[in-house]
Design a protein with these regions (language model features):
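Active-site-proximal, Lys/Arg-enriched surface segment
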Residues: 31, 59-134
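Short, positively charged, Gly/Tyr-enriched micro-motifs
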Residues: 12-72, 176
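Residues in flexible loops and secondary-structure boundaries
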Residues: 48, 70, 103, 297-298
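Short, well-ordered amphipathic alpha-helices
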Residues: 45, 126-128, 160
Length: 392
């Protein structure tokens, strides 16, 4: 699919309030310029368009049209509608929160200033969708905010509202996947309290209480109560500097079990999953999950859900690599509205580039069922024949 054809689909009248000729041309120019320049800097975007007018005139046109609050909502709705058409009941809705920093910035609207004015940043919540065994994804929503934006209540509220917006567009189809590393416990608690949201969440707060019949237990206590019946060997690719001076392929024995519990805040019955990992050089580690997924009594169902969660890291890594190739921190707009629209248009370009790349993993899988290829430090011994093959 060409970028022009993707733009036509994004701007189709059926997706949202119809765009006028000026807005349609602007969207087409921005997608082409962002893709061609690999940048969110308006000067570089304008230069990539190579229009038969002065660079200053192109820049001025883009900047003027970028200041449009209605267009922010319109394009965001279009991108969400376009993606939500592909979301089914088992689609992973992966939630990731990051920060967009501008060092020594002073004049950007609603930009909170960090201590000593050295660094300041906006929060960005991205929700991307991926099928359970897929090696690709598609963006659904990018939401930008800061503590200074009028009406701000809390980061947790911003994340929760983003999740609800996506689920409204998908008619509550899809399962929210959260690795609590970037999403706060407060945001997770809001999701747990909602009886309609389906989720698979790694829970950092082990003191969180759940009900088993008439008794309450912390997740820490539940880890000891649940038998981890099903297990298998996985190989984890560990980055340089964690276990040594080179990449390491770590052999892991992964075993899991689950038990039915109730969430006190909602009274909703869910499954608690205990995931334990152990290697030849590391002690056993237990991780608690809560999920609304049912029918997890078989090995295939439970370990399949665990695999789906573990592979989420590969999808996020691929997304971060692609997103960062556009150097989003190099934006040079002063208004919050322009930044919102820039980030939404970037998500659209990412959606296009992912769609044309096909179902191919652009980065190494962190977790694999067999040893990773290459010259790696390994925590296990390879058979001689395998050693020859993997070193090629």
């Amino acid at each position: 699919m060409s970028l022009d054809r993707f733009t036509d689909r994004l701007c189709a009248d059926s997706l949202a309030k119809p765009l006028g000729k000026v807005d349609r041309k602007f969207v087409q120019s921005m997608l082409k310029g962002i893709s061609g320049s690999r940048s969110l800097n308006l000067t570089e975007i304008a230069r990539a368009l190579k229009e038969n007018i002065s660079l200053h005139a192109t820049h001025k046109r883009l900047s003027r049209n970028l200041y449009d609050e209605a267009l922010v909502e319109n394009i965001s709705e279009r991108l969400l509608r376009l993606g939500s058409e592909r979301v089914g009941p088992n689609t992973r809705l992966i939630v990731h929160v990051s920060e967009l920093h501008k060092k020594f910035a002073r004049k950007i609207e609603f930009l909170p200033i960090a201590e000593e004015n050295a660094e300041a940043g906006f929060k960005v919540c991205e929700i991307i969708a991926s099928e359970p065994e897929s090696k690709t994804y598609f963006p659904l929503l990018t939401h930008v905010w800061s503590h200074e934006v009028p009406g701000f209540s809390s980061d947790a509220e911003e994340v929760f509202n983003s999740v609800r917006k996506v689920l409204h567009a998908t008619s509550n189809q899809g399962m929210v996947f959260i690795d609590n590393g970037t999403v706060s416990q407060a945001a997770c608690d809001m999701i747990f309290a909602d009886r309609m949201i389906n989720y698979m969440i790694l829970v950092e707060d082990r003191s969180m209480q759940v009900r088993v019949r008439n008794d309450c237990f912390s997740l820490e206590q539940m880890l000891d109560r649940v038998e981890t019946r099903y297990g298998k060997i996985l190989y984890k690719l560990v980055p340089v500097g964690i276990l040594g001076a080179s990449q390491t392929d770590l052999d892991l024995f992964v075993h899991a079990g689950c038990s039915g519990v109730k969430i006190p805040s909602s009274g909703r019955p869910v499954n608690f999953i205990s995931l334990r990992t152990k290697s030849s050089i590391l002690e056993e580690h237990a991780t608690p999950f809560l999920t609304t997924q049912t029918n997890l009594r078989s090995r295939k169902a439970l370990m399949g859900l665990v695999d789906s969660f573990l592979s989420m890291g590969d999808i996020l890594s691929m997304h971060r690599t692609l997103r960062d190739s556009f150097k989003p921190e190099n934006f040079r707009v002063l208004s919050y509205k322009r930044l919102q629209l820039l980030m939404t248009l970037l998500a659209a370009v990412i959606g296009y580039e992912v769609s044309v790349s096909g179902d191919e993993m652009l980065t190494d899988q962190v977790f694999a069922k067999s040893p990773h290829d290459g010259q790696l430090q390994r925590t296990y011994l390879l058979p001689e024949n395998d050693s020859v093959v993997l070193s090629r």
